[in-house]
């Protein structure tokens, strides 16, 4: 549906949220520009890590996240079918004890129930499939999303076909708010927009004291995360995924970055060993990431991760060979239930998106649209509002506000200061 009022929209951040929103808002008739500080789009976690298109069991303690995942998954697959990677198997396993010897954070009954929220779920015999140390395991029809060049090339074609200009190597220093516009300040100058969308992964350009203004007192941490890269020596026509739940357990995901058959690239992550630090500021997490090198990863991280995966999948290292590592800094909500859906809000004409799971880009966009329409109404509609009072754009409140607010001084020779009767009575 195209909108009655065409707005100039500037989007900062060329990851999943930024690129998807650019396409959706262009379809609605807005003029859209995209700004990415790196040399290419999808240079963060969404373009480099193997990413699950969640059906929900990953979050057994957050029904809200599971419901959001299932709702968003259907819409995502309908929107980007060419980027959906279907799996031979997607195993969710319930571990006996995590890396610290602790039991799972959920009971086996609860774990089974959340897996069977997906109607195609089937129970798997762990030992018959080469696994150990598991209470139970289930196979779901759960895909992942393509990454790397396959993802970038798909979106470059889509953005180009839509006529959306992408500013690369464009670091946005600040967003300047005025009464009717927002200006994006880069090293090349200023760009004027009606609406700016901050899709930087909640890492920059945030309003001062925004935590105090939000309707919920949310906790945020910035985590330095890495993934170990492996090559499958026995590639199949379709890839597989394997995760142990719920606590400090390992996970294996495919990292599909081409359309070639028999994909070999996988990543190994862990609930604790590949989350290397949690910080109050993104910059602190980036400092840790920048300090890492292959020697540090090989000596301090890789042995723990391989010990953990082989506790549950003894044949892993016989099939997969280590090829390196990659890292990123991610914003994460601090919640007891591990809530992971996105949050979207607007302040001063800037819409900010706190990222959730990749499929949440669809639902985040659905929230952005009414926020943009509300901005259009406030700035370009026929009704204005001030402190709860509404009036039309033809009202003198709007057209002559300065003039009607300019009041005469006390005692000034002015009709509004006349006291004629009192003066006549006094004179007599």
Curated annotation (Swiss-Prot):
GO molecular function, one term: monooxygenase activity
Biotech uses: Kojic acid can be used for several biotechnological applications, including use as an antibiotic, as an additive to prevent browning of food materials, and as an antioxidant. Kojic acid is also interesting as an inhibitor of tyrosinase. Finally, kojic acid has also been shown to have strong nematicidal activity.
UniProt signal peptide: none
UniProt-annotated binding residues for FAD: 52-60, 328-329
Enzyme Commission designation: 1.14.13.-
Gene Ontology biological process terms from the UniProt entry: kojic acid biosynthetic process
Annotated knockout phenotype: Leads to the loss of kojic acid production. Leads to the declined expression of kap6.
Cofactor: FAD
Induction section of the entry: Expression is controlled by the kojic acid gene cluster transcription factor kojR. Expression is also positively regulated by the secondary metabolism general regulator laeA. Expression is negatively regulated by the transcription factor kpeA. Nitrogen deficiency increases the expression. Expression is also regulated by the kojic acid related proteins kap1, kap2 and kap6.
Name of a matching Pfam family: DAO
Annotated SUPFAM superfamilies: FAD/NAD(P)-binding domain
Keywords from the UniProt entry: FAD, Flavoprotein, Monooxygenase, Oxidoreductase
Site, Important for catalytic activity: residue positions: 421
InterPro entries xref list: FAD-dep_OxRdtase (IPR006076), FAD/NAD-bd_sf (IPR036188)
Gene Ontology cellular component annotations, sorted alphabetically: cytoplasm
Protein role: Probable FAD-dependent monooxygenase; part of the gene cluster that mediates the biosynthesis of 5-hydroxy-2-hydroxymethyl-1,4-pyrone, also know as kojic acid, a by-product in the fermentation process of malting rice that acts as a chelation agent. Glucose might be converted to kojic acid by a combination of dehydrogenase and dehydratase reactions involving kojA and probably additional enzymes. Improves the antioxidant capacity via the accumulation of kojic acid that is also a strong oxidant.
Family from the record: Belongs to the aromatic-ring hydroxylase family.
Name of the molecule in the record: Probable FAD-dependent monooxygenase kojA
Species of the source: Aspergillus oryzae (strain ATCC 42149 / RIB 40)
Gene: kojA
